[in-house]
Amino acid sequence: YAGGVFAEELLENGIQTIVLDSVGVWYGLRLGANGKGRGYDIHIFGGEHGDLPLIPTAGAVLAETLVRTRKSAIIDTTGFATEAEQRRFMADFAETFYRLKMRNKSRVTLILEEADDWIPQMPETTELRMLGAFQRIARKGRNFGIGLLAISQRPQGVHKKVLNLSDVLFVFGISGKHERKAIREWTEYNEIDEDVRDKALGMLPGLKMGQCLVWAPRF
């Protein structure tokens, strides 16, 4: 839900927004607040609600199209038959998108739903090219106008090189040991005061729906 609010704010302010959706839920941006009627004018590629289907070999073509037109889009990968097809598509997309943005600078935000699908901490061999492409976007993309919003229920599954590059961290209620360990490591990397860190981490299991803690140590 919080990610959707961010996306709405970006779209309201005319910022190109591209959602990489591996769960098939972001089509709701096109619906009105009551679940009916018209929402935002955003293209959907792939999935049950797609305007056009996704072809595993068309990642580079779609990246080129979105850079050229500067249109917002939802890329729904739920229709791919295999994980291999999804990884190939996203590797091609991310590599081409970054390369073209180097020559075509403009503001755009990539939203990675279930970010551990795209930037896994423990990648399989077939995920390495995709991971490398997104790592480069996370590390250097801001120089060309690319912002990155990574959403995950499993922060321990998100590659640490990318997680540690995050300027702002929103943490909603979590109680799992491994999840809290990943958050602790991020706060330690960013040199958050130990007393503040321990108090905040102790609050996480008790947060209610819609409540979150926000860390922004560089601001």
Model regions and ranges:
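Loop/turn-to-beta-strand initiation segments
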Residues: 14-18, 70-74, 103-109, 143-149
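Switch/coupling segment of Walker-type NTPase motor domains
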Residues: 4-95
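Substrate-engagement module of ASCE P-loop NTPases
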Residues: 11, 95-103, 130-149, 191
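Ser/Thr-glycine-rich phosphate-binding loops at phosphate-binding pockets of nucleotides
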Residues: 1-2, 149-155
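Conserved H-loop
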Residues: 22, 113, 146, 153-154
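Conserved beta-strand segments of the P-loop GTPase G domain that flank and frequently precede/overlap
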Residues: 20, 75-77, 149-151, 171-173
